[in-house]
Amino acid sequence: MSYSLLRVIAPAILCAAMAAPAAAQAPGVMDDLLKDVREARGKIVGLAKAMPESAWEWRPGPGARSTKEVFVHVTADNYFIPVGAGSTAPAETGIGEDYKTVGAFEQRTRTREQVLAELDKSFAFLEQEMTATPEAKLATPSKWPKMSTRQLWIASTTHLHEHLGQLIAYARSNKITPPWSR
């Protein structure tokens, strides 16, 4: 190989070799979803702590969940949704593949402190299970009909934001400013 050809090829090979690890480390969809879940976690848990116990029993009208019931529902689904990706919810939750187990979990009597502790544990579980999902598994079917594992994790994230918005409305209806808006 001639010296002039080597001067052209060597830098190209070096650049390609340096770019490969950078491309392999590019954040994937799970990194983006986890970032979003962590942000929602901070806000939902922050609202739960900021709202006095008297506001936890408030509901906007008959048939609507109370504030406490929304926190418990978020907790339950943080355990239930990963089940659709093949995870096993902690045994003490009683949550399995049948959605009726979610209803049973939500009906348990709890104090405010118990709800706060369980809410935080459920987010830790959700994040752990999302983190354990390799990008290659995202295109595979979940246990739920017509839903890929990717769609399941996206649904989990949008579910959190749906209830975050609901909880913001509940807080403001009770003249409580969300902590991040102060």
Feature map (PLM): residue ranges:
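Acidic/histidine-rich alpha-helical segments that form the ligand environment
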Residues: 103-140, 151-160
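N-terminal secretory signal peptides that target proteins for export/translocation
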Residues: 1-6
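Boundary of Sec targeting at the N-terminus
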Residues: 24-27
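Short, contiguous alpha-helical
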Residues: 34-38, 42-45, 55-101, 141-182
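Bacterial N-terminal signal peptides
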Residues: 9-21
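Membrane-proximal, proline-rich intrinsically disordered regions
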Residues: 51-52
